[in-house]
Structure formats: structure tokens, C-alpha cells
């Protein structure tokens, strides 16, 4: 199993593709051609690299967390600190690239979907930086549980549109953003937030996020003298996971683990564990694993984490799962919240609830792999946006709040 890194789409095995209305074909063709040209253009590559150095804050650090690791069977645990990026997550890596591309193709307006609000904040940030008009679609449920990020987007000058259809979460936000793009395709570029959707989005977003793994591979080698035994990341659509996995795909001795949102439990109706519980189908212009009923209709997902509350997953993850190259496991809401508190109290780092799914998974993984193992975790975002959820969950805010 070698040379997996060279597979660029539009298909990853049987997954991926481009199943869209005729009205979007020309826009996707334009985007695809522009990206193929720009990604090998030395001037574009250098401009993006310099932006990341002076604006994003790359390379991001790695941090070893020994007190947290004591709870993982003593395995050595290293975090890739995407939470330290400007705007607080990995999302800025993708957005700066797509915003630069938007300028190059001469469009003045960008739109995006967002769940946790991190992609929306990053997109609004890039729009402010480059002087672009910006509209963000966000499920009404998510605008309520991520109100801080809604305020950030509006402060940055973006229009935030709450989506009231369907389950009022990420899936529905993508639907409305797609409709906007169909209507305004001449002036508008859709800055897609994850490695899902129609080609070229899975490949392009992966290309823009793979810097995470490229940096981390060098950093872990420098710190430990060898590659990690396992690389772990949370998986919703899956961009942070592909971003850190990609550099290791052809290292057969490095195991890859994606931790999905199990919600109340993967065996309950309230889950977002797409690969664990789903089967192949069509959603948002691509074939991938989906949560669906016996009639093939996409069903609502559930997660305490807005960013993982999605009934699909990127096609490259579906392919890696079927190949056996990566393993995908569910983590419940309660397990994720417990890991969030544990990292906060043992290391002084408050992670995003999304990232806490990877932390929870790694706690179990460490016990399986033993004390000699090195586990690299993508800490994809910081937890500031989740303080209201965590405050309610742990009863931190009232007079009788938990003190121990």
C-alpha cells in the first residue's frame, strides 16, 4: 500500500465525483482549472506561504502533554497546535488559499457554510483582509450554540444568515449556500469549508490543509527521533484529519485514527458517526458514506459539537476506511467533554469540543498501544467558542458552580 498521497480526485476509489446541477458545472470547471494552475505557480505558493508566516502564525507548534498522557496508559502524547492559529483553528489554512484564489479569478463576493462557526470566522477574516463581500450560512441551532462566533463574524463585516430549514444545522447551511452559488455564480465564489462536496473541493481543501501534517512530521521527527506510532484527529467532514493524515499516508508503520462524533452513542439514533454507522450514498455533490434511512434518505445527525454535527464525511476518508489504511471510531458527547476537562486541568489548554473527540479517542488508544507508543493528535481548535456549552454541561457559571 504505497503512493496513496498522489491520489488527487475527482475519485477516491468509488467515492467522490461531481454530481451537481448543470448551472454549477461551469463554476466548478473554472475553480478546478484555476486551482490546478495556481497550486504549482511559484508566486502563488510563495504568497500563501508568506501569509501563513506573517498572518496565520505558521508553522504551528507541537506540545508534549505528559500529565494528560498519564491517563492514556503512559503513552507519549504530542499535540499539533492548530488552536494557536489566527482565528483559533485549522480553518484559516484553507480559507486564505481559497480567498487568494477568489482574487485571482476576479470575483468580489465569497459565501461559506459554517457549523461551529470557525470556518465562518476564518472566511469573514479573509474577506476583511482582502476586501471581499462575505455572506455566511449557519444553521439556526448552531447560531444559538455558537453565538460568540456569530458576533465575531458580524464584527468582521460578514452577513450571517441563520438557516431555518431541515435540522437547522450544518447540512442545511450547505444546502442554502449551494443555492446562493447557483443564483450568483458570476460574481461569487463558494469557499467550501471541508474535504466534502463536489470535485475539486475535497482535493483542493486537502491540498490547503496538508501543511499541518507536513510540519508535524518534521517536528515529531526532530523531537523524538522517529515517526509516531499513531496519528489521531476528529472527523466531521474531515479536513483537519486529512490535513494531518496526508503526510503519513505512505508510512505503513504509522496508524491513522479518525474519531467521529458518537453523540449519545453510535448505536442510538442521536449520533454523527458516519463511517461507523453509515453506508455509501450521495450528498452535496459527491458519493461518500452517509447516515441514511432504509429508503436512502439522509437522516439528521446529532453531536454536542456543532462542527462534527454532519451526516456525511469527505470521500477520501470513506476510501481510506474501505482500504483499511485509516480506522474510524465513535466518541460520545460525554467522553469528549470529559477529555476536554482533563486536558484543561492537566495541561492548561482548553480545546474545542471537536478536538476533544480526538483527545478522548487517544486516551483509549494509548492504553491499547502501551507506554512505548508515540501518539500525535491534531488539536484542531481552541475552546473559547464552546464556553457556553461547557459552562452548562459542567455547571460552571451559577453561584453553586462546580469548584473541584
From Swiss-Prot:
It is an enzyme of class 4 (lyase). Gene3D superfamilies: 3.40.50.1100. Keywords: Amino-acid biosynthesis, Aromatic amino acid biosynthesis, Lyase, Pyridoxal phosphate, Tryptophan biosynthesis. One of its GO terms (cellular component) is cytoplasm. Its EC number is 4.2.1.20. Disulfide bonds: none annotated. Pfam families: PALP. SUPFAM superfamilies: Tryptophan synthase beta subunit-like PLP-dependent enzymes. Pathway: Amino-acid biosynthesis; L-tryptophan biosynthesis; L-tryptophan from chorismate: step 5/5. Tetramer of two alpha and two beta chains. The beta subunit is responsible for the synthesis of L-tryptophan from indole and L-serine. Belongs to the TrpB family. This is Tryptophan synthase beta chain. The lineage of its organism: Bacteria, Bacillati, Actinomycetota, Actinomycetes, Micrococcales.
Amino acid at each position: 500500500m504505497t503512493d496513496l498521497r498522489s491520489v488527487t480526485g475527482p475519485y477516491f476509489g468509488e467515492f467522490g465525483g461531481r454530481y451537481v446541477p448543470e448551472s454549477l458545472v461551469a463554476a466548478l470547471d473554472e475553480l478546478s482549472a484555476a486551482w490546478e494552475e495556481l497550486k504549482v505557480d511559484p508566486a502563488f505558493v510563495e504568497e500563501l506561504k508568506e501569509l501563513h508566516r506573517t498572518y496565520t502564525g505558521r508553522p504551528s507548534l507541537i506540545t508534549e502533554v505528559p500529565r494528560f498522557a498519564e491517563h492514556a496508559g503512559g503513552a507519549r502524547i504530542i499535540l499539533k497546535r492548530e488552536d494557536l492559529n489566527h482565528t483559533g483553528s485549522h480553518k484559516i489554512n484553507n480559507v486564505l488559499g481559497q480567498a487568494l484564489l477568489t482574487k485571482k479569478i476576479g470575483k468580489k463576493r465569497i459565501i461559506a457554510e459554517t457549523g461551529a462557526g470557525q470556518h465562518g470566522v476564518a472566511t469573514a477574516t479573509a474577506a476583511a483582509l482582502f476586501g471581499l463581500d462575505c455572506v455566511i450560512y449557519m444553521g439556526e441551532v448552531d447560531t444559538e450554540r455558537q453565538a460568540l462566533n456569530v458576533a465575531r463574524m458580524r464584527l468582521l463585516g460578514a452577513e450571517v444568515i441563520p438557516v431555518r430549514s431541515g435540522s437547522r444545522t450544518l447540512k442545511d447551511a450547505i444546502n442554502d449556500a449551494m443555492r446562493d452559488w447557483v443564483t450568483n455564480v458570476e460574481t461569487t465564489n463558494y469557499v467550501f469549508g471541508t474535504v466534502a462536496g463536489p470535485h475539486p473541493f475535497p482535493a483542493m481543501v486537502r491540498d490547503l490543509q496538508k501543511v499541518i501534517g507536513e510540519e508535524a512530521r518534521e517536528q515529531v521527527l526532530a523531537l523524538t527521533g522517529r515517526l509516531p506510532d499513531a496519528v489521531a484527529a476528529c472527523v466531521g467532514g474531515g479536513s483537519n484529519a486529512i490535513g494531518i493524515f496526508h503526510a503519513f499516508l505512505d508510512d505503513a508503520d504509522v496508524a491513522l485514527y479518525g474519531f467521529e462524533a458518537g453523540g449519545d452513542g453510535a448505536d442510538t439514533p442521536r449520533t454523527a458517526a458516519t463511517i461507523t454507522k453509515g453506508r455509501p450514498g450521495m450528498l452535496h455533490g459527491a458519493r461518500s458514506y452517509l447516515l441514511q434511512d432504509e429508503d436512502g434518505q439522509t437522516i439528521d445527525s446529532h453531536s454536542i459539537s456543532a462542527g462534527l454535527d454532519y451526516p456525511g464525511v469527505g470521500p477520501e476518508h470513506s476510501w481510506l476506511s474501505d482500504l483499511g489504511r485509516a480506522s474510524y471510531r465513535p466518541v460520545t458527547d460525554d467522553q469528549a467533554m470529559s477529555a476536554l476537562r482533563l486536558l484543561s486541568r492537566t495541561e492548561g489548554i482548553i480545546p474545542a469540543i471537536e478536538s476533544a473527540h480526538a483527545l478522548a479517542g487517544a486516551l483509549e488508544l494509548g492504553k491499547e498501544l502501551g507506554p512505548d507508543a508515540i501518539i500525535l493528535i491534531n488539536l484542531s481548535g481552541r475552546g473559547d467558542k464552546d464556553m457556553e456549552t461547557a459552562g452548562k454541561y459542567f455547571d460552571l457559571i451559577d453561584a453553586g458552580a462546580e469548584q473541584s
